[in-house]
Structures are given as structure tokens and as C-alpha cells.
């Protein structure tokens, strides 16, 4: 490896050739502020446009941006000269002069990178006055709010949308003072190819991109006495919510989270993991049927709503490959309202209000899909995110970190370890393989850990020997990688039998409205490890071993993929390509 030797603040350091001054400074634990820069090399996410100029440092007699200047042999860098510090201050002051001064009521207050840098630089007044740019706020979707008055043109969202997700909704428009990152022709997000994956939100350093706030609606539901309000919680939430209360990323906070939800006033606190186990029952059966018939392969998983939006808009002619299974959120809601409510609690489905807590803003949109319900009663009434739940807990004055742990309620609170790993890339496929293997072979699977489908590579593939039969599998993370694999499928080059797709890099643990990771991918890794730790700790690690699931089939669903199971647990998809004027319903079993 070719190394470059340089000095930063009189400290010597050696870095690989091609490294930047910022890379070298990090090796010395010297902090240089950045706004536009984002480098999550583990998942190939890099935004290095050097546009904000907040990272200016002194080299010789001049100033250069640390994030975009390569380290050179013998270079002498000073990060804390008067010239460098004043340059940073001026840049931040200019940004603030064209920025709304509403920090106290901004959704990003306390997590805003611009706010943090301004505080660290000791900026206490806005010296520059003048005309402010204006952009309308887009509230057209049920998931994302676009408030570009707060945009600082860092281009992170543009990189994420175009380079990583290949959706291509956001781009720079206009010139000079009128420059902004926007949709084509200032089109509302609801009328674009946006999949609502929320990754633009996860990397936005300010409050320019946020989620639709559903907290008031949940409070209203909790404070009225007309309906029984129940809540379900996704697996990724339990290993991330602790971050909002000072706990380390990946801390397993399941029991404390349940206690907090009960303190908020939810009548019953259930686990989306029950829905995940149920999803595996249906999806494994569906896969086995298709595999034996060699029909509609490869089967594409359907748990991720952003992925479903993506394939509906980009590959509608291949929707026949998509599993008809609802997501765990949808399956849970359907069972809660059509089994739990009438048969266990003796109440009408319309009198149950189901709230979901998800790591994902696309789940808000998923709840609103008309096909996800029965008789105009939605499976899930409303979805909030991990951060929204944290806000509700704080509003109620609850100290989550010091709560005594409480268990989920029965019967929809029981789950296996297979359900927990749904929250990380490869988890859905691994859970499906655990069940499919035993159903195909009628033999016990001794080692349930499928390490070949684990890890954070964007595309992982493996050939699994199922008692002499080879099953070729693929795990895909990010929509850009999904596009690559779909193009292989279309060209006939694909050898896969089953493909798992998650829109977020690393899976749901990196969802668009989890606690902000600020570009630190180690946080996402710790969350994923937390889920694997939960799986390892459970006695039952195969979905078909869940006693409550077995009871549900015996009492209500009959068997996987039965007629009644299809009625409540399966769905259909639509051609949403802009090429077509009318939505066309497409299902995989027609």
C-alpha cells in the first residue's frame, strides 16, 4: 500500500494514497466540521461535493476544503488558524442569514448539524442581513415533508436519491441565489417516482426533509374512549429507541419500551414480530409452491413498502414475481381486527384502532393503501416512527431508561428469533429458509444460522443445499442494487429462486426515521447485532414453532396459503408507471 506522510497541527500521520485531509485528520482524532460531506464507505454512500466550505483548513498561505483536498507527501496542515476558523464562521453565518430562525419549533431541533456547528463555532448573532430565498413547503404525501426553506444545498439527498437509490426524484435546479434542490418542474412529491424510502431524510443535515407528524392523531386516539387502541412494534425499534434516551446503539430495550407504551395508555401492547412469523408461514409456503411448479421465479419478497412502490413504478410488468404476502405490519393489523377483535376480545373490527411503531416513513403510506383492509376498515389505522414514539415518551415525562421491564401482551406478543432478524438485511430470507428447509425435507434444521446471507454488502448471493436440492438466493440492500438485480432478471441472466429486497442500506435498522446516525454506520451495525443477539437468546428460532401462530392456524386460518389466509394475509399490486394513465391491478397468482 502506498502511503502519504503529512503533518496536521504539528502531528505526523501516514494515510493511504488517495486519502483526503479530512481522512487524515480523523486518524489523528482531530475534528474538522463538515456539512455537505458524507462518507458511509461500508455501503458505498459518499457525498463529496465540497460545496458547503465549512471544512476549510490552512495549507501553506491558503485555505482549502479538507473533505475534497487530497493529502500530499510533506503537506503541512493547520486546522485551527485564525484564517481557517474565521472562514468557517463566515460560511456558517451566511448559511444562517438565509435560513429560517425557528429552531425551537423545528423538527430537527437538537439533531440539526447546522445548529450544532453554529454552536461549536460560537456564533451568537447573524451579522449578514438581506433578501431571503423562498421555497414552498410540500406536504403532498403521507410520509415526507419537503421544506426547502431550510435547505443548505449540501446535495446529500440528491446523492442518496440518484446515486444510491437510483430513483432520480431530486436534483439541483436554477442558478445563483435561486439555486435549490427540488423535484423536476417543482412537482409535488406525491406526483413523482418517489418511493418514500426516507433515506433523503436520514442524511439531511437540517430540517429541510422531515416526516409527516402523526403524533397528534395518536394522542387523540388514546384520549378518546370509543375504540380499543392497540399498538404493534417493529423489531428494529427495540434496538434503536434507547439512543433517544442516552443508551448505546444496539441496546436491547424491549421490556422498557413495552412498559413505556403501556404508560402512554395503549390498551394492549403487541409485537410486529408476531406478524413477521406469520409472514414467514405464508411466504415460505408460497415459495415452496412456486419452486415445485417452477413458476413465477424468482419470488421477490414484499415486506418493504418502499421496494413495493419502486417495483410498481419501475418494473410493473414483473409484479407477477412479487410475493402476494402483506408485510408483517399489514398481516398483524389484519389478524388484530379480524381475529383478535371479534373472536378474543368480543369487539367489532371497526372499534379497534391499530397503531404501528416502525423505523420507516414508507409504512405511513402503506397504511393508506386501499387494498390493505376489509370492508373499508384499514388493517392498520396509523403508523408512527421510532423517533415519534421517543417524542411521545418524552412528552409524557416518562424516563424510559429507568423503567422496569414488562412483557408484550398475549396472544399477538409471542414470537420467535426468526422474526427479530427481519430488521436487518438478509433477515427475512434467513427466517424463510429456516422454515422452508424443514417443510421441504421433513428434517430438523440443526444450525439455523445462515451466515452466507448476513453482512452489509449491497448484494449477497448464496446457493443453499436443501437435502440435495440447490436453492439459489440473493439478498439486496438499497434500491440502486435492486435495479441491478431486476435488470439481470429481465435479461434472463438471473439464476436466483428467491430474492430479498430492502430499500434501506443495511435493512430496517437503517430506516429513514430511526434515530439519526449522522453518517456513522457503526451505529447501524450495532443495531443489527442487537437483533442477532435477541435471536440467539430465544429458545424458539423458527417461525413455524411459534405456539400462538400454530393456534391461529388451528382456530382461524386453517393452513398457510388457504383461502381464508389469502383473504386476510395476501394482497395485490398496481402498475404505477408514469407511462400508463390508469392504475392496473396485478397479482402474482393470476
Kindly label every feature range from the protein language model:
Residues 165, 204, 340-344:
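Structural motif corresponding to the C-terminal cap of alpha-helices
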Residues 188-210, 312-316, 328, 383:
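Helix-enriched interaction subdomains in cytosolic or periplasmic regions
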Amino acid at each position: 500500500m502506498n502511503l502519504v506522510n503529512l503533518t496536521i497541527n504539528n502531528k505526523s500521520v501516514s494515510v493511504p494514497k488517495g486519502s483526503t485531509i479530512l481522512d487524515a485528520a480523523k486518524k489523528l482524532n482531530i475534528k474538522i466540521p463538515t456539512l455537505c460531506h458524507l462518507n458511509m464507505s461500508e455501503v458505498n454512500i459518499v457525498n463529496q461535493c465540497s460545496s458547503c466550505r465549512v471544512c476549510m483548513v490552512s495549507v501553506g498561505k491558503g485555505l482549502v476544503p479538507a473533505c475534497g483536498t487530497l493529502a500530499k507527501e510533506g503537506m503541512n496542515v493547520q486546522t485551527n488558524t485564525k484564517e481557517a476558523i474565521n472562514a468557517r464562521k463566515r460560511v456558517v453565518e451566511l448559511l444562517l442569514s438565509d435560513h429560517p430562525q425557528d429552531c425551537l419549533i423545528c423538527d430537527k431541533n437538537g439533531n440539526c448539524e447546522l445548529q450544532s456547528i453554529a454552536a461549536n463555532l460560537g456564533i451568537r448573532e447573524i451579522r449578514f442581513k438581506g433578501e431571503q430565498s423562498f421555497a414552498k413547503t410540500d406536504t403532498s404525501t403521507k410520509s415526507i415533508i419537503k421544506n426547502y426553506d431550510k435547505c443548505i444545498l449540501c446535495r446529500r439527498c440528491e446523492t442518496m436519491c440518484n446515486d444510491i437509490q437510483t430513483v432520480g426524484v431530486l436534483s439541483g435546479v436554477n442558478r445563483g441565489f435561486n439555486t435549490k434542490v427540488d423535484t423536476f418542474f417543482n412537482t409535488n412529491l406525491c406526483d413523482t417516482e418517489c418511493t418514500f424510502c426516507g433515506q433523503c431524510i436520514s442524511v439531511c443535515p437540517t430540517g429541510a426533509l422531515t416526516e409527516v407528524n402523526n403524533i397528534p392523531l395518536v394522542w387523540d386516539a388514546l384520549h378518546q374512549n370509543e375504540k380499543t387502541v392497540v399498538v404493534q412494534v417493529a423489531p428494529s425499534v427495540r434496538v434503536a429507541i434507547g439512543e433517544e434516551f442516552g443508551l448505546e446503539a444496539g441496546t436491547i430495550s424491549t421490556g422498557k419500551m413495552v412498559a413505556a407504551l403501556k404508560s402512554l395508555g395503549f390498551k394492549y401492547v403487541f409485537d410486529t414480530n408476531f406478524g413477521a412469523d406469520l409472514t414467514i408461514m405464508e411466504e415460505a409456503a408460497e415459495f415452496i409452491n412456486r419452486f415445485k411448479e417452477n413458476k413465477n421465479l424468482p419470488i421477490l419478497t414484499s415486506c418493504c413498502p418502499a421496494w413495493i412502490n419502486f417495483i410498481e413504478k419501475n418494473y410493473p410488468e414483473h409484479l407477477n414475481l412479487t410475493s402476494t404476502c402483506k408485510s408483517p405490519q399489514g398481516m398483524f393489523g389484519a389478524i388484530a381486527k379480524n381475529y383478535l377483535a371479534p373472536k378474543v376480545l368480543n369487539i367489532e373490527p371497526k372499534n379497534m384502532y391499530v397503531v404501528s411503531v416502525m423505523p420507516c416513513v414508507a409504512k405511513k403510506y402503506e397504511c393508506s393503501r386501499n387494498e390493505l383492509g376489509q370492508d373499508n376498515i384499514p388493517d392498520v389505522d396509523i403508523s408512527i416512527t421510532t423517533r415519534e414514539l421517543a417524542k411521545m415518551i418524552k412528552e409524557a415525562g416518562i424516563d424510559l431508561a429507568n423503567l422496569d421491564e414488562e412483557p408484550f401482551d398475549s396472544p399477538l406478543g409471542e414470537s420467535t428469533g426468526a422474526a427479530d432478524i427481519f430488521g436487518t438485511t438478509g433477515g427475512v430470507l434467513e427466517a424463510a429458509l429456516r422454515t422452508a428447509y424443514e417443510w421441504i425435507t421433513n428434517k430438523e434444521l440443526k444450525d439455523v444460522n445462515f451466515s452466507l446471507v448476513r453482512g452489509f454488502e449491497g448484494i449477497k448471493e448464496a446457493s443453499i443445499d436443501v437435502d440435495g436440492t440447490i436453492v439459489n438466493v440473493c439478498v439486496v440492500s438499497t434500491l440502486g442494487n435492486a435495479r441491478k438485480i431486476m435488470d439481470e432478471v429481465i435479461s434472463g441472466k438471473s439464476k436466483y429462486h428467491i430474492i430479498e429486497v430492502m430499500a434501506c442500506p443495511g435493512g430496517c435498522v437503517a430506516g429513514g426515521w430511526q434515530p439519526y446516525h449522522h453518517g456513522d454506520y457503526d451505529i447501524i451495525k450495532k443495531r443489527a447485532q442487537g437483533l442477532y443477539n435477541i435471536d440467539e437468546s430465544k429458545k424458539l428460532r423458527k417461525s413455524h414453532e411459534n405456539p400462538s401462530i400454530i393456534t391461529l392456524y388451528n382456530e382461524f386460518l386453517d393452513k398457510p396459503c388457504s383461502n381464508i389466509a389469502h383473504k386476510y394475509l395476501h394482497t395485490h399490486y398496481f402498475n404505477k408507471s408514469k407511462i400508463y394513465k390508469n392504475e392496473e391491478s396485478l397479482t402474482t397468482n393470476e
